[in-house]
Amino acid sequence: TNWPTLDPLTHITESTKQEEAALYALRGEKRDTSVREYDNDAIGLDAKIMSATSAFPAGLFASYHAYPYYPDFMVLDPDYNKASTPEGPSAYYGYLKELVDHHGDMPVVISEYGVPSSRGMAHWQPQGWHHGGHDERAQADIDARLTRDIHASGAAGAVLFAAIDEWFKKNWLVIDFENPLERNRLWLNPLDAEQNYGIIAMRAGVRDSAMSIDGRANDWRGAKALYSSAAQPSNEPLQLRSFSVRSDEAYLYLRLDVGRVDWTRANYLIGIDTYRRDLGDMRFPYTGAASNVGFEFVLDLRGPANSRLLVDPPYNLYRIVDGYRIYNRPFRSQPNEDGQYDSIRVAPNRRRIGRNNVDYPAYTYDRGLLVHALQSQTTLADWYADSTSGIIEIRLAWGMLHVTDPSSRTVLHGDAETGEVAGVETDGFRFVVQSFDPRTPRGSGERLPNAEAAVPTWTWQMWEEPRWHAEIKPAFETMRQTFAELLGLPAAVEATDQRSGTRPPRLREPKR
């Protein structure tokens, strides 16, 4: 099996490292030599040089693993970006058509393709068919469209990747921060696109007690509140009634109960100390209020469209410099009290200069921006504030908080001398919650616990065997229908086949 990096075509937008360095030199710029990437158009392997003899009547076909978002020539080539099918523009179709045409009478099979339903995005694509960043409904729709584009290109067949989500996989954008790497099979990282391709989901936790972001209290039964206010409950938006924490193999879950949700009158900050009370920022943003524990992160809840997770600058993983993702070594939290926090910006696509001497800018996005929605509406839901109950629920992927292995309670704490990635066991997390009026941020508000009280440590049990359960994603039925339509078969049956009584596969889950 081949892949686009070794295809027999030539791509004018894809310079090699050596070619790109020369182009930078002509411009008087110095290229960042620390970029780790393949030369994606240096050598080609052409299946056409082989032919079957009469002793091999079955013949030969060319097989490619071809995804729509990588290498960069898939998204940058000007001719590919002019291509379209009756359904609309498709740079992917443009590439496939050239690839299939090159092979002439030799059949071409796209033996891997698809997009993952991960929160994290590892590479951007112009039609929105990114390497991650899709909810499960979008994954189904995109996988179906890619299948039709493969068919339209004249390819002889297509094999969708993959049957199930794979917790053990790793992706270039997060691999350095899944540490120890041999333990990443013990937890699900929603930031890791490679782990979430399946048409059958491998969910974290036990099915019967799985958490859902819905603004309701039913899945919090049995969870004792970390903080509770002694004040008489009221409908005052600034009132903080209680704060609770739970977790599973994929997420940290937070529940904040307030008097009433009214974003014009009350915003909320949740300071999060992930390692050592004496490290991190000892002040909140906006309000300037002091804390007796340092925050590595602050949840900034300002309404459905503008809430995000912020990070203390010394602990930010990256700096984006001239379109390059530069590691912010030594990846260590530092004591400070300036109340300044960064957005969590990442660069899935770096800046490039093509062989055509065209400058292609980087693509960056704010990983910390939170999606406000019910989980029943989108599997990318990060949080939901229920205006009726006053319950605010948030889930944060462990990797968002620089937890490199939740199963061993390991958090990022780099080597001060070498600047290399390293981890350290934390005793748990500490949380401080503050409400404030956005019209007068330094005015009155409430706080849990109060400023004079000690901040307790919340912790979780380590594990050597993960809890999980399987669920069928929308792509399962969508792809059943799509393949049937392209093959001219009768309409595919529903997930339960009434004629045979069979059901989609049910995987054996761990006994609890």
Predicted segments — roles?
Residues 231-350, 412-438:
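Surface-exposed, glycine/proline- and aromatic-rich loop segments on solvent-exposed faces
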Residues 262-264, 338, 344-348, 353-357, ...:
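Ser/Thr/Pro-rich, low-complexity mucin-like regions
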Residues 11-51, 176-193, 321-360:
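Charged, glycine/proline-rich intrinsically disordered loops and linkers
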Residues 274-296, 402-509:
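Acidic/polar low-complexity flexible segments
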Residues 215, 250-259, 390-398:
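Short, well-ordered beta-strand segments enriched in hydrophobic/aromatic residues
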Residues 120, 124-128, 138, 149, ...:
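Aromatic-rich peripheral "rim/lid" segments of glycoside hydrolase catalytic domains that contact
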Residues 1-129, 133:
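Noncatalytic carbohydrate-binding groove/subsite architecture in carbohydrate-active enzymes
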Residues 53-57, 101-103, 152-153, 246-248, ...:
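Extracellular/periplasmic catalytic domains that process cell-envelope and extracellular macromolecules
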